Regions:
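Bacterial N-terminal signal peptides
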Residues: 16-28
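Acidic/polar surface patches and capping/hinge elements
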Residues: 32-460
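Bacterial N-terminal signal peptides that target proteins for export
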Residues: 2-18
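Basic/polar N-terminal segments that are highly enriched at the extreme N-terminus
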Residues: 1-7, 30-34, 460
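Selective for proline/serine-rich intrinsically disordered segments
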Residues: 8-12, 26, 137, 393
Length: 460
């Protein structure tokens, strides 16, 4: 396991002026994006992605989209193993039409015709408008028609394969004793003190993986922090209590620790963007061959998103196997039997605590999955990236006013540096104990490694 050190102070941040300027300036380069990266952006960002649910639901959708894109291109010119067996496409099939039709067809196939809602309308408008624009740029004729057919065939194959994968029942009735160390439903800030969020996604740990052999293949052993009176728990408890306190962070809204907590959204929401940014700005990584064609890009995105989705299944399997409590419950507990932990009944996490158990962390799990695929694809950890994230407003305990939305820029010179910061983010956000975060990275890496080794391999 990699070592993610505990930091009592924010890590020194060299200015790296030239790198930072280059990374931030890279965003406009997305105008040069390919059909693969353009459609990935549509599927993995608002308003489309949030319509499908939280991070694990979005990961499943992204995996299905990218598999269809990969298989559609592979049916035109076979270069890698296909995920689903498809008939060969016509030789003149237009690749860009295939990519557009594959994405469009998967997304439409996953959206129920009813009921209507503003979110659904916004998602469909984004998908339909992008599809119309994509086809308008492709010459009319047999090539376009055959490309659309290839994309639709790949989409239909993955939709059929995942029709009964268990995703329809993400939530199960939650029952657990009210006891020390056991996850309790997450309270809601600034509402009725008895208001709680119903625990979510227990059923996700039972879902059919894309590549892993079973949901429990990479289940982790119990953590050291499960010993509530032990040194590991005491250390993690006191760290998150001090660093992740909403009042502490709210009093230092522009500190690096507060920025780190806000920069990293739920699950792997930013990692598709990271990959697009890396491909769009080759000058930031001159040591890498980033001149990937559509087939190579499609394979890379498919591997990364299958890894993230399988890692999410593994993490929810682990979470609900152990049902370890969150800091928001642990710190408010009147007496946990550990004389070295002092309770605080009024403590709130800086970032909203999600409604599922602590161990392991979903963000770091997704980060480990994506970075392991990137590490193996490019055969190096030294991959630089960075961008500006528009962090939303953060509510604080009453009577304090919420922190306003803020643009936060972060940059990294390696994948390991990024995953280490993802670990810190969940501690500084008050959402997780550190051990669950560090092991989340490792579990994600295990899933990413397995996917890379067993799926979409080059044809010999």
């Amino acid at each position: 396991m990699r070592s993610y050190s505990r930091r009592s102070e924010p890590r020194p941040q060299p200015l790296r002026c030239a790198l930072l300027v280059a990374l931030v300036a890279a965003a406009p380069a997305l105008a040069q994006a390919s059909s693969v990266t353009q459609w990935n952006a549509i599927a993995s960002t608002a308003p489309v992605a949030p319509f499908f649910g939280g991070p694990p639901q979005q990961a499943r959708v992204n995996a299905m989209v990218q598999i269809a894109v990969h298989d559609a291109l592979n049916s035109i010119q076979p270069r890698y193993e296909s995920y689903d067996i498809l008939p060969g496409a016509a030789a003149d099939a237009n690749p860009d039409a295939a990519v557009a039709a594959a994405t469009y067809s998967v997304l439409h196939g996953l959206i129920d015709p009813k009921p209507d809602s503003p979110a659904k309308t916004a998602a469909l408008d984004a998908i339909n408008n992008a599809y119309a624009a994509a086809l308008a740029d492709i010459p009319d004729g047999n090539g376009e028609v055959h490309g659309i057919a290839a994309g639709a065939a790949a989409a239909n194959a993955i939709l059929a394969r995942r029709a009964n994968d268990g995703s329809a029942t993400p939530n199960l009735p939650y029952a657990a004793p009210v006891a020390i160390g056991v996850y309790q439903p997450t309270p809601v800030m600034n509402t009725d003190p008895q208001a709680y969020i119903v625990p979510a996604n227990e059923g996700w740990g039972l879902m059919q993986p894309f590549v892993m052999r079973s949901p429990s293949q990479f289940r982790f052993a119990p953590g050291k922090l499960f010993d509530i009176k032990g040194q590991a728990y005491t250390r993690d408890y006191n760290e998150v209590k001090a660093k992740g306190d909403a009042l502490v962070r709210g009093a230092m809204p522009d500190s690096e620790e507060s920025d780190i907590a806000r920069f990293w959204p739920g699950g792997g929401a930013n990692w598709n963007r990271v990959l697009r940014e890396i491909l769009a700005a080759p000058a930031n990584n001159p040591q890498l061959d980033l001149d990937l064609d559509l087939w190579q890009q499609a394979r890379l995105f498919a591997l990364a998103n299958m890894a993230e989705s399988d890692a999410a299944i593994a993490v929810f399997d682990t979470k609900y196997t152990y049902r370890f409590w969150r800091p928001i419950t642990a710190i408010r507990w009147q007496d946990d039997g550990n004389p070295a932990t002092a309770p605080d009944a009024n403590w709130w996490s800086f970032m909203a605590t999600p409604p599922y158990p602590d161990y392991l962390c979903g963000l770091t799990n997704a980060s480990g999955a994506h970075t392991e695929v990137l590490r193996r694809y490019f055969r190096t950890d030294d991959i630089a990236w960075g961008f500006t994230f528009n962090a939303p407003s953060v509510p604080l305990p009453a009577p304090l006013l919420p922190l306003p939305a803020k643009s936060i820029t972060r940059s990294f010179v390696s994948l390991d540096e990024a995953t280490a910061e993802a670990v810190d983010a969940r501690v500084f956000g008050g959402m997780h104990f550190r051990e669950g975060c560090t092991k989340g990275v490792t579990q994600g890496e295990q899933a990413g490694r397995f996917v890379f080794q067993h799926a979409l391999r080059p044809l010999r």
